[in-house]
C-alpha cells in the first residue's frame, strides 16, 4: 500500500513528517542492518586464487572487485541521520558538528557566526529537505555541509558560476604520477540521500520492495580500487594484495585537488638603503618633493603686509587700548637656516596679529550640540567614565601624595625667574577671573600643501601669573598621579614617570586603529564639559570646595593682552595655560570617547590632551556623530587610521615591543627653523642640537622591519612616498652624529660679514694700514709677480698704504687660532676670485692660497 508523500512545509519538516525518519524506524533499520551484516560475516567464503602471471589491464573500468570481504564491524555511515539524532547529541558534540559544517571564524573566544543550537538543527533539517526536493534550477546546489553553512549564514544555496567554471577548467593531467592516474576528488558532505522507490515514491528504508541485500553488497564491494584507479601495475594479483603490499606507500597520497592560489613573487630587497652618506642638497630635494609648496615659502614681510594693509574684523565685546602699548624688545638676531622647509619667522604680538589670533582661537564659538539636561547627563557621563577607565579598588586604596613636595619643586623650578615664597599672594584677595593673554611667537609647522594660499595663524595662550599657578599646580599634579595609578591596565596616558609610549609585549601590527581628530577643541568646550570635569574631580578625591571654587571662576572670565592693548570676555572655554589645561583636556577627551564607543572592544587606549588612539582586533563599532551633536566638537575619524598620536608614529620591533618615532616630516621642518637666537659661542644652537638628539634617540632601534613599517604608515597618513621617509632617517643619522655636522644647517649674517672683511689663518697674513678711501668689501686676486700698487691717500696722516699678502705653503693640518677662524671652517662663505688662469667664479672648497696668486684685502 503506497502512502501519499507529505507536503513540504516548515511544520512537517520540523515534526519529522517530511524527509526525516522517525527514531523508531531508524533504530529498527539499524538493528536489521547489523543482523544482516553479522550473517554475511558468518557465511563469507574466500575467493579462489588467481594466477600471478596475469597482468591487470590498463582499462580503469575493467577492474573487478571481490564479491565480499571479511569485516569485524559494519560502519553505520550509510545510515541517514535526521534532525532528531542531533537533538539527542550533547552540546560538545553539536559544537564539533557546527565547527565542521559551518566553519565559523574564530576571533579570540568568539565565533563568527555565533553558535545557536535551534538554528543549527533547523539548518540541518532544511538542508536535507532541499537535497531531496525536485531540482528546479540549472545551477549546482552546494553539498550538504556547505548547504548547512549557507542556510545558517543566510547566503546563496548554489555554487557561484566562477566556482563551477574553476571545477570544469581544472586540469589535473599535469599532476599525474607516472604509473598512476588520479581522478578529481570532491569533499564528501557526510550525508547520503536515501534511495527513493520508483514504484511507491517512498524512501526505500520504509518501502516493502526495498532490497537490503543489494545495498549491503554494494557497500561491501567498495574497495581501494574504487577511490584510486591503478594503471600499468603488472603482477598484481588482486586489490587486496595490492593494498597489503603497497598500502604504506599509497595511503599518504590524498586524491584531492584544489585550485592553488598564485604563489607570491618574492621581491628582492632594495639595495638602495638610506645611509649616512647624506648632503645638504639631498635633504633639500626631499623637502622639495615631499612639501612642494614649502620650498619657495618666505614670510619675511608677511606681517609687514598685515600691519600696513587695510584691516577689518568682527568681534563681540572687544576692548582696545592703544595708548600704552609696549614696544617690541629688540634681540640680537637669529641663525639663518640653510634648508628652506617652510618655517616662518617669529610673530610679533601686535594689535592686528593678536586680534586675528583671537578671532580664530577664542571667538566665534561653534554651537553644534543639541539641547540636553546638563545636570543629569553630566552625571551619567561621569559614571560611564569611571566604569570604563578606573579600577575602583585602586582608587579606594590610594591617597594624595607629594602635594607639598610638588609645591617646593615648582618653586625651585621658577626660582631663576624671580619667583619666591614671599611673592605668593592671598588667593582670596585675587580676582582669579582675570587671565593674561599672548600669542605664541613660534608657529606650528604646517604639513599640508597649503602654504601658497593660506597664512598660518599663531596659537594663543591664556594663563595666570606664576604666583597663582604655583598654588594650584601641586594639587592637580598629585591628583593626576593618583589618577594614573588607578587606571585600568589597557589605558595609557603617555606623560609622567609611570607611563610612556613604550609598550613592552604589545604589537601594533595586525590591529585596527581608531584615531579621532577633534578640531577647535579648546573654544568648543561649554558648561556641559565643565560639569563633567567637576563630577570627575570629585570622584577622584579632589576636595569639593576647591573643585567648586575652580569651576566657578571658569564660568566667566576676562582675557587681556597688555602688549597689544586687547581685551575681551570669554566663558567656559579651556584656558590654554593654567594649571589644569592638560589634565582637563585629557579627562574631557576620555569622557567623550567612552560615551561614543564601548571601551571593552579595545586592547589598548591611549589619550593625551585632545589626542586619542585605540587598538582593537575587530573594526571598532561606535557612534562618532555624538562628538558633534552632544559635545559640540568638530570630530573627524581619520581614514585610513594609522598608529599615530602626539605627532609620533608607533612601531613594533621583531620582539613584539612597541616604541614611538617622531614624525619625520615635522622633524625635517624643524631643521629649517628660524627661531634660534644668535650667540658668539653657539650655546643656543647647541641646545637645539641636544634637543634634536633626544627626540631622535630611537634611531638605534630602527631595523629594516621598522623602517618598512614607518614607510607604510607614512604613505597612508600623508599620501606621500614612503621612500622619502627612509631618506629622512638617513639625514637624521648624519646630523645627530656630532655638533659639527649639525652646524652645517645654519649660518649667520654676522659671521659672513666679518669673514668677508677680514680673516686670519696660517696660510694668509693680512697687514692693514690706514687709507682715506673706504675699505673694500671684496678681495681682488691677481698674479704673484704683479707689481701694481694700491692708490695712495691722506687718511691717517697722508701716508701711502699698501697691503702685502704673503703666501706660505700648507703643511699638515691647519690649527684653529681664533673663534673667527673656526667659524670660517664651519661656515661656507663664497669668496669672489679672479684666478691666474682667467677663470672666475665662487670657490667654496679650496682657499685662494691653493689656487695660486695674491689676494688683496
From Swiss-Prot:
Q: Annotated region Disordered: where?
A: 780-857
- Top EC group: transferase
Annotated ranges, domain RdRp catalytic: 511-624
SUPFAM superfamilies given in the database record: DNA/RNA polymerases
Gene Ontology BP annotations = DNA-templated transcription; positive stranded viral RNA replication
- Give the catalytic activity: RNA(n) + a ribonucleoside 5'-triphosphate = RNA(n+1) + diphosphate
Task: Quote the function comment for this protein.
Answer: RNA-dependent RNA polymerase which replicates the viral genome composed of 3 RNA segments, RNA1, RNA2 and RNA3.
What family, per the record?
Belongs to the ssRNA positive-strand viruses RNA-directed RNA polymerase family.
- What is the protein name stated in its UniProt record? RNA-directed RNA polymerase 2a
Specify the taxonomic lineage. Answer: Viruses, Riboviria, Orthornavirae, Kitrinoviricota, Alsuviricetes
